[in-house]
C-alpha cells in the first residue's frame, strides 16, 4: 500500500501548495478548439482520434502525444477561451457601454502571492477586463480587509472580487471569504455557491476556477464523462471536493481518495477519469492507472534538479513518464490545468458582469 501525505493542492487564488506556487458560469463556447473523441478499444489500450467537422481540425491535426497518450494542452485551450472572452468583452462594451471589472485584495508581501496577482492583472488586461487592486500590510487588521471587501461589494464597476490566499494567520479566512457578495464571488468559494453545487436541481452562481478548468478540459477534448468511473485524489474545499461534485453532476460514478483511504491504488485502477490534486510529486504511478484512462493533474510540485537553472523543476502528482505510456490522454505539468485556472477566473468575471447587467 502506498504511503500518502495529502496537502491542500490549489492552483487558483491560493498559494498553499508550494511557496513558489502558483462558475456556474455558462460561458463555455467549445467550437473553436480541437474536439478529440477518445475511444478505448475493447482491450482498453487503444486510442482512436477523430477530429470534429468544425474549423478546429487544424488543431486536432497538431495534437501532441507522448508515450501513446494524447497531451491535453491547457495552454492552447486557455488561449482559445481568452480569445472568446475578448470578443464578448468587446461586444458588451459596444452594446451597453459596460466593461467587466475584477478586484483583487492582497494582504502582506509574499512574493508568490504578489506574482499571482500580477499574472491575474496581466490576464485581465489581455482580454479587456478592468482590474482593481488593494494592497494591505501584513499587520493590517481583519476589519481593514473587510472594509475593502465591503467597498468592492458596493462598487458597480466591480463584477468579481478575489481575496488572495493565504491570509495572515491572525485573520479569520472564512469570515473574510464569506463577506464577499455571492453575486461577485468569482472564486466560487462562498458556502452558498458550494452548497448549491452539491444539491441536485440547484445551480451555483460560480464554480471554483480550478475544478471548473479541469472539467472544461474534458469538454474541450470531447471526453465523455457520463457513465464513466471517475476518481478524485484529494478532498480540499478548493479543488478536490468541487471537482468530485462537478463530475457527479455530469453523471460520472465518483470515488474520492484521501489520506485515510485504504489501498488507493486499487481504487484508482478502476477509474476511466482521474483528477489528482494533493500536492505530492509523482505519487500516482503508472501501475495505478487503468489502460486508456484520462488523467488530469492539478499538482504543481517543485523537486530538486541541479541541472535546472533555478535548481528545481516542477512536476505533478502523477508520474508523467510512466502514466503517459498507459493513459489515453494526460495533462502536462506545467502547461495543463494551471493556465485554465486563470481562464476560468476571467470567464466567471464575464459571466458575473453579464448577469448583473442582464446582458445576453
From Swiss-Prot:
Pathway listed: One-carbon metabolism; tetrahydrofolate interconversion
The organelle targeting sequence, given as a residue range: 1-51
Modified residues (N-acetylserine): 52
The keyword tRNA-binding is assigned to this record: no
Pfam families: THF_DHG_CYH, THF_DHG_CYH_C
GO cellular component, one term: chloroplast
Record-stated family: Belongs to the tetrahydrofolate dehydrogenase/cyclohydrolase family.
Record protein name field: Bifunctional protein FolD 4, chloroplastic
Protein's organism: Arabidopsis thaliana
Source taxonomy: Eukaryota, Viridiplantae, Streptophyta, Embryophyta, Tracheophyta
